[in-house]
C-alpha cells in the first residue's frame, strides 16, 4: 500500500508543494476549528487565528499554481546537488549519553558485536563534548557547528536578570496581541509568537540550500520546528499539553502527602467499586474565568471493557479500556473542550497501581496528540500526522520518559523501564521509516533511552552509591536491574546492527553510504550534590533575609542588597551585577573581574571533607569558555565537577540547604554535568576518521564537506579528515 511519504527521495523536488496540499486536506478534514494551546511552562495561548483555514486554502492553491515551475527548478538543482559529494547518503545515529568506558567494556566482553564490527570497519574514537556537557547545549553545538557563545544555549534554564527567576532557555512565548470578544468568549485574531532562542543555522539547512534532502528525527533543541528541505520531528523542549516539560498525575484515596516534584497528587473517593475524577488540561483562554479544561473519567473496579479479564474498567469520553495492575494502557486520546466548538486533543497512558487497600492510579504527562497536534511539532506539520497514521500514536513530549515519577517513588523500576523501551521502539519505527525514504541525503536520529536509563539505573552499578538499594533497604536482595544498563547497551548494539544491515548491507557496504554512531557526552555517577548557594553564604558572597524561610525556592530568601553572586540551574554561577540584575551591587569592569577571579581561586579544587575527594576540578570564566555575540547571556562562572559530583538538586531551583555537600539518594543517580574533559562521547564510523581529537561540533562541518558543500565561516567546528572515495 502506498502512502503520501512513501517516495520522499524520488519526489524531493516537489515535496514542499505536496506537503502544503496534504496539510490543507488534513486541516479541512478535521471536523473542528483549527485552534490550539501552547506554552512551555509560561501559560497557554491560542495558537492560530480565525482565518487559518482560509489562509491555508490560499497557500495550497498557490502551491498548485507554482508547482510546475518549482518542479523544474528543483529537478535541475537536484541533479547538481551531488556533483561534488563524496557520499550519497550520510546516516548519523545519536545514542544520547553513551559512555565510552562502558562501550569499550562490553565490546571487550563480546556483548556488542555490531559496534565492534563498525569500529573495525572504519573507526572508533572518543568524541569531545562541550562546556557544560548538558544535552541541550551539546546537541545545539552539534546541529549548528558553533560554540555556545554563538548558539545561546547554556543550560535547560536561564536566569531572568530582572526577577532572578528561571526561564526555559530554548523557547519564549508571547500570547496573541489582538483578540475579539464575543459574549463570554475571547478569540485571537493573530497568532502567538513562539520563538526559538537557540541561534545559529542547523547544518542540514545549509545542505538544503544546496539541494540535499534531510530527515531529522527527534534531535534535541529543534522545537519549534524550522523549515528545511526535508522533514523534522521535534524533540527536547516540546511541552506537554499543559505547557510544562512533563507533569504526571497520581490519583489516590490516600490523604495528600508532601508536594510532588514533577507532578501532582489528586485525592479521590471510592464509592463502592467506582472512582470518579478528571484529567486536568490546559488553561481555557477562550472562556472567561473558566480555569483549566477538564476531561472526566470513571474507573469501575472489578469490571472489564472487553471479554478478557481485567482489574478495572476505565471510561473516558465515549471509550472504555481495560486496566490491569502494573500494566500500561496504550496511548489514549483525550479531548478537552474549551467551548464555542473549540477543542484540543492530547494523548496519555494510564497504569493502575493498586486497588486495595488504597486505590492508586498513575497517568503519564499528557502529550500533544501527533495525529492532531495542538501546535506544530514537525516540519511539515503533516509529518507528525503521517507517522501517527502509519504507526499509531507516539510520545511527543521532549523529555518523554517520566523520570520524576520514579524519583518520587510513584512508579517502580520496572514501570519506568517499560516506558523507556516502549518509546525507543516508537523511535525505531520512525528512524527506519526515515531511512527508507532518504535514499540520498542526510538522515539523523537521536535515541534518548541511553540517557534516561543511565540517569535512573546507575545506582545499581556501584554498591557504594548512596542510592544503591542495599544502602536504603536493609532487606534488599540482588535484583535483575543490576544488569539493566548492560542490557541497554546490548539492545542499542542490536539497533546498530539492524541499521548496518539496512544501510551498509551484510558486508562492508559500497562506500556510498556512511554511518556514524555518536553520543553527545558520556556518563558518570552522581553520588554527592553541592549546594553552591550555601558555599557562597559560607564564603561571604551571599546573604539571606532575616525572615528567610528554609524551604523557599527560586532564591526568594536572598537579600540582594548584600549578595554578590548566586547560583541557579545546572551550569554555574551568576554575578549580581549592577545595571544588569535588577538589584545588582557589583560594579561592571574591574570589580567584576576581581570578584570572578577570587571565586575561581577559592572554588577550584574544592574538597569534600566526608570523602576526601576533589569535588570541583575547575571553575571557568565565561570570557574564557565562550566566544560569540551571545556570550553575555551565559552564566558568569561555569563549574567543572569531578566524577561523582554535581550541582545539588535544590541549587538547581534556587532553594538553599543547611550544608554544602549532601548524599544523592534519588533514583536519578547518574549524570554528565561535570568537567567536559572527563566525559567525552563516542564516535563509531563506517569510514576511517583520520583526524585526532574529533569534537561534537565538528560533525556538522564534516557532513557539509562530505556532500561537497562549503563550510560557513562562522562555524567553529572543522571538517574531519574522512577516508572515503568518490560517491
Briefly describe each language-model feature range.
Residues 60, 64-75:
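Membrane-spanning helices that line or support transport/gating and their immediate boundary helices
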Residues 72-88:
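N-terminal signal-anchor transmembrane helix
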Residues 35-61:
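Hydrophobic alpha-helical membrane-interaction elements
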Residues 1-36:
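N-terminal secretory/membrane targeting signals
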Residues 645-691:
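Low-complexity, glycine/alanine/valine/leucine- and proline-rich hydrophobic stretches
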Residues 86-88, 101-104, 109-110, 120, ...:
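Secreted, luminal/periplasmic, and some membrane-associated catalytic domains
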Residues 370, 374-384, 429-444:
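Short amphipathic alpha-helices and their capping/turn segments at secondary-structure boundaries
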Residues 225-229, 437-494, 498, 575-590:
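Active-site His/acidic residue clusters
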Amino acid at each position: 500500500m502506498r502512502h503520501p511519504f512513501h517516495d520522499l527521495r524520488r519526489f524531493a523536488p516537489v515535496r514542499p508543494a505536496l506537503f502544503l496540499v496534504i496539510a490543507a486536506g488534513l486541516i479541512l478534514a478535521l471536523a473542528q476549528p483549527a485552534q490550539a494551546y501552547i506554552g512551555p511552562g509560561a501559560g497557554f495561548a491560542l495558537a492560530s487565528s480565525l482565518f487559518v483555514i482560509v489562509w491555508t486554502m490560499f497557500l495550497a492553491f498557490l502551491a498548485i499554481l507554482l508547482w510546475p515551475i518549482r518542479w523544474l527548478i528543483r529537478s535541475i538543482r537536484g541533479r547538481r546537488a551531488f556533483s561534488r559529494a563524496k557520499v550519497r547518503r550520510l546516516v548519523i545515529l545519536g545514542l544520547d549519553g553513551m559512555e565510552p568506558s562502558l562501550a569499550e567494556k562490553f565490546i571487550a566482553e563480546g556483548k556488542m558485536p555490531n559496534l565492534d564490527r563498525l569500529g573495525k570497519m572504519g573507526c572508533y574514537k572518543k568524541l569531545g563534548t562541550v562546556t557544560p556537557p548538558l544535552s541541550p547545549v551539546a546537541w545545539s553545538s552539534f546541529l549548528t557547528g558553533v560554540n555556545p557563545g554563538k548558539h545561546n544555549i547554556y543550560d535547560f534554564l536561564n536566569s531572568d536578570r530582572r526577577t532572578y527567576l528561571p526561564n526555559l532557555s530554548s523557547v519564549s512565548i508571547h500570547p496573541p496581541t489582538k483578540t475579539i470578544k464575543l459574549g463570554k468568549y475571547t478569540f485571537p485574531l493573530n497568532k502567538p509568537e513562539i520563538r526559538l532562542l537557540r541561534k545559529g543555522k542547523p547544518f542540514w539547512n545549509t545542505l538544503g540550500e544546496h539541494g540535499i534532502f534531510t530527515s531529522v528525527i527527534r534531535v534535541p533543541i529543534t522545537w519549534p520546528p524550522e523549515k528545511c528541505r526535508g522533514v523534522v520531528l521535534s524533540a527536547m523542549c516540546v511541552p506537554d499539553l499543559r505547557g510544562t516539560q512533563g507533569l504526571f498525575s497520581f490519583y489516590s484515596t490516600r490523604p495528600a502527602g508532601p508536594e510532588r516534584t514533577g507532578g501532582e497528587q489528586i485525592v479521590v473517593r471510592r464509592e463502592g467499586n467506582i472512582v470518579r475524577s478528571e484529567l486536568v488540561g490546559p488553561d481555557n483562554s477562550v472562556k472567561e474565568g473558566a480555569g483549566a479544561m477538564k476531561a472526566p473519567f470513571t474507573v469501575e473496579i472489578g469490571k472489564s471493557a472487553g471479554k478478557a479479564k481485567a482489574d478495572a474498567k476505565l471510561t473516558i469520553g465515549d471509550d472504555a479500556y481495560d486496566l490491569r495492575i502494573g500494566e500500561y494502557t496504550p496511548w489514549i486520546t483525550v479531548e478537552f473542550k474549551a467551548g464555542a466548538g473549540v477543542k484540543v486533543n492530547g494523548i496519555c497512558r494510564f497504569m493502575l497501581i493498586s486497588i486495595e487497600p488504597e486505590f492508586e492510579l498513575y497517568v503519564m504527562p499528557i502529550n500533544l496528540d501527533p495525529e492532531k497536534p495542538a501546535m506544530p511539532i514537525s516540519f511539515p506539520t503533516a509529518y507528525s500526522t503521517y507517522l501517527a497514521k502509519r504507526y499509531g500514536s507516539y510520545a511527543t513530549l521532549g523529555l518523554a520518559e517520566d523520570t520524576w515519577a520514579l524519583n518520587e517513588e510513584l512508579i517502580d523500576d520496572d514501570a519506568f523501564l517499560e516506558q523507556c523501551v516502549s518509546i525507543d521502539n516508537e523511535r525505531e519505527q520512525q528512524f527506519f521509516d526515515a531511512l527508507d525514504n532518504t535514499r540520498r541525503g542526510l538522515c539523523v536520529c537521536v535515541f534518548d533511552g541511553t540517557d534516561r536509563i543511565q540517569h535512573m539505573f546507575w545506582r545499581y552499578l556501584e554498591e557504594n552509591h548512596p542510592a544503591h538499594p542495599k544502602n536504603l533497604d536493609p532487606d534488599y536482595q540482588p535484583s535483575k536491574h543490576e544488569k539493566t544498563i548492560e542490557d541497554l547497551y546490548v539492545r542499542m548494539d542490536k539497533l546498530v546492527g539492524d541499521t548496518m544491515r539496512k544501510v551498509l548491507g551484510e558486508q562492508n557496504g559500497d562506500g556510498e553510504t556512511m554511518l556514524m554512531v555518536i553520543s553527545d557526552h558520556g556518563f558518570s555517577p552522581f553520588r554527592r550534590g553541592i549546594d553552591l548557594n550555601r558555599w557562597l553564604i559560607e564564603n561571604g558572597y551571599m546573604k539571606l533575609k532575616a525572615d528567610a524561610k528554609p524551604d523557599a525556592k527560586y532564591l526568594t530568601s536572598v537579600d540582594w542588597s548584600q549578595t554578590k553572586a548566586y547560583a541557579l540551574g545546572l551550569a554555574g554561577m551568576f554575578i549580581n551585577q549592577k545595571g544588569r540584575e535588577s538589584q545588582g551591587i557589583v560594579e561592571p569592569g574591574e570589580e567584576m573581574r576581581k570578584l570572578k577571579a577570587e571565586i575561581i581561586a577559592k572554588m577550584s579544587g574544592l574538597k569534600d571533607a566526608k570523602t576526601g575527594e576533589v569535588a570541583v576540578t575547575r571553575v571557568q570564566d565565561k570570557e574564557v569558555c565562550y566566544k560569540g555575540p551571545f556570550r553575555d547571556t551565559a552564566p558568569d562562572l561555569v563549574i567543572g565537577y569531578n566524577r561523582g559530583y554535581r550541582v545539588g538538586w535544590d541549587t538547581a531551583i534556587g532553594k538553599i540547604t543547611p550544608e554544602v555537600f549532601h548524599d544523592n539518594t534519588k533514583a536519578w543517580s547518574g549524570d554528565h554535568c561535570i568537567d567536559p574533559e572527563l566525559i567525552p562521547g563516542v564516535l563509531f564510523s563506517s569510514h576511517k576518521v583520520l583526524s585526532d581529537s574529533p569534537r561534537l561540533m565538528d560533525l556538522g562541518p564534516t557532513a557539509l564537506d562530505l556532500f561537497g558543500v562549503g563550510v560557513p565561516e562562522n562555524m567553529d567546528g572543522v571538517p574531519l579528515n574522512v577516508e572515503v572515495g568518490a560517491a
